Amino acid sequence: LDYYHFVSARWLIKPEITLETFKEKMKQVLQNPFLGQAGADASERSAPQRFLIVGLGESGYAMAKWCLVQGAFVRLADTRAHVELLTRQIDWLDDLQKLGLVDTCFESSDWSTLLDGIDVVGISPGLSPIQEPTFTLLSECQKRNIAVWSEIEFFARGLYALEALAMAAEERYKPSILAVTGTNGKTTTCALTAQICERAGKHVALAGNISPAALEKLLSVITKANNFIELPEIWVLELSSFQLQFTYTLDPTAATVLNLSQDHLDWHGDMQAYAAAKARILGKNSVLVLNRDDEVVTALFADEKESRKVIQFGSDSPVDIDSFGIERDPRAGGIDWLVWAEPDEATLASELEEAQEGFIKHKRRKKLDAYEKSDELRIKRLIPADALRIRGRHNALNALAALALARAAGLGISPLLHGLREYQGEAHRVQTV
């Protein structure tokens, strides 16, 4: 499966490049959208072609559809009987069959047979790795050296393939990926991040646990776009611990674990495993957006703060350059302000120039130390917490996290504040009735 079979790939070909030339170019760049990052020599690797998708939920449907569109072989399995499927799931199954799905198995239990001839298992996030029948499935995969991917792993590889395809066509597509997880506040923070980035003039795609599935959204934007310019500039992803468990190559521009408390222990087994799954959100090159109020989160990333760019937020005054916090003005009965430790003008001008070129160079901690220690922090008041339409101190922290994520994508503060004021919140979350 060569990557030129990618859905709607023909619009990605420059007019002066013939299809034959483009095919030859693509063979030198990567084999197909399942190889992952294009940094390694794709010609030396064998891309997976045969997939077992386990679970007909939203993610399972998205994975199966993505693979079928790419021309890969798909086997779909679900532990439920066909008669137990909901109307929506029956519609999904009909859609997949129209795309060429013929190999299905319901009330699945014989994994040894289902895994025959399979290169990769795509697993739905609702299936716990420590519970049967998933535990037996994973054990069998390990014995056979069969990879297990989440839907987000498929998404990451598809996005990297799209970036490589742009490069082959002498174009540039390098979107920012802003990834959010945590026990609480994920949906609000993601929706708010997407809105303020859009308010700053960016084309934003919001997907993941918040719905739609990331792969479904990726397929949709590719199908609708006529050129690279029409693709999202920023992807905002809400990711659960379930989705992160089998994700390996996602490397977000910035990532945050908003907070951590005991949750989903029946799925993970214990708090340590739960926290470890959450920590997978941080990629090799990601800016860490860190909640300094949460002791569990700060301990989880204690070893990361010296090796990468960190933007902190919390309910007290900022402690580092470019970090965020809350300060109280004792006048007028006490007003809480969202505040920012503003970088110097030279730094801001440099970031603006880099952002206009389509990328941000995140300085390592060693390069920041001299500046941080040489001057007092310049604390800038942004907006009163009461100016937010979403209420509660927890939502003020969600707003700070959104600002930090947008800053990591190279966006200036001023247009983001308009988006903060306008955000009305999500349904059934601290609503006035």
Language-model-detected regions and their locations in the chain:
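Flexible loop/N-cap segments at domain edges
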Residues: 402
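Extended acidic/charged loop-beta regions that coordinate divalent cations
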Residues: 111-112, 171, 225-266, 301-385, ...
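N-terminal leader/targeting and accessory segments in enzymes
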Residues: 3-154, 161, 391, 411-414, ...
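Phosphate-binding loop of NTP-binding sites
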Residues: 4, 35, 44-45, 68-69, ...
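Gly/charged, well-structured mid-domain segments that form the phosphate/adenylate-handling core
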Residues: 389-391, 405-433
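Cofactor-binding loop segments of dinucleotide-utilizing enzymes, especially the Rossmann-like FAD-
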Residues: 56, 79, 182-183, 209, ...
